UniProtKB/Swiss-Prot annotation:
Top-rank taxon: Bacteria
Keywords (A to Z) from UniProt: Ribonucleoprotein, Ribosomal protein, RNA-binding, rRNA-binding
Protein name: Large ribosomal subunit protein uL14
InterPro entries cross-referenced by the UniProt entry: Ribosomal_uL14, Ribosomal_uL14_bac-type, Ribosomal_uL14_CS, Ribosomal_uL14_sf
Gene Ontology process terms (BP): cytoplasmic translation
GO MF terms held by the record: large ribosomal subunit rRNA binding; structural constituent of ribosome
Organism of this sequence: Escherichia coli (strain K12)
C-alpha cells in the first residue's frame, strides 16, 4: 500500500538508493498502489556515477510491499520493506540491468516480463 510521500527502497542497479512516491498513476483520485502498480517517483538518495541522480523524476513499478499480496488460494506474501524498480519515463522499460531480491508472480504481465526475467527469485 504505497501512497504519496511514501519512501521506498530501489531493487535495481540504476544508481538510486531511496525514492519517494509523488503520485500514484492510474485514475484521477487513486490513493494507493500495490505490487505491480506504476507510480511517479523522485530520487532522494543516489550513489555517485549512477545512471540516475538525486532530484530526477521517473516512473517506477512497485515490486515488494509490507502490506503484501493476497493470492486466490488465501495465502498472503509479505515483505520486510517497500521496494520498486525504476522505469524509463517513455518506454516503461527498466533502467537497471540487474534486480535485487525476490519479486512476486503478480508482475507476470506483458509489460513487466523483463523484470521477471532479471529477478533472482519469483515468489
Amino acid at each position: 500500500m504505497i501512497q504519496e510521500q511514501t519512501m521506498l527502497n530501489v531493487a535495481d542497479n540504476s544508481g538510486a538508493r531511496r525514492v519517494m512516491c509523488i503520485k500514484v498513476l492510474g485514475g484521477s483520485h487513486r490513493r494507493y498502489a500495490g505490487v505491480g502498480d506504476i507510480i511517479k517517483i523522485t530520487i532522494k538518495e543516489a550513489i555517485p556515477r549512477g545512471k540516475v541522480k538525486k532530484g530526477d523524476v521517473l516512473k517506477a513499478v512497485v515490486v515488494r510491499t509490507k502490506k503484501g499480496v493476497r493470492r486466490p488460494d488465501g495465502s498472503v506474501i509479505r515483505f520486510d520493506g517497500n521496494a520498486c524498480v525504476l522505469l524509463n519515463n517513455n518506454s516503461e522499460q527498466p533502467i537497471g540491468t540487474r534486480i535485487f531480491g525476490p519479486v512476486t508472480r503478480e508482475l507476470r504481465s506483458e509489460k513487466f516480463m523483463k523484470i521477471i526475467s532479471l529477478a533472482p527469485e519469483v515468489l
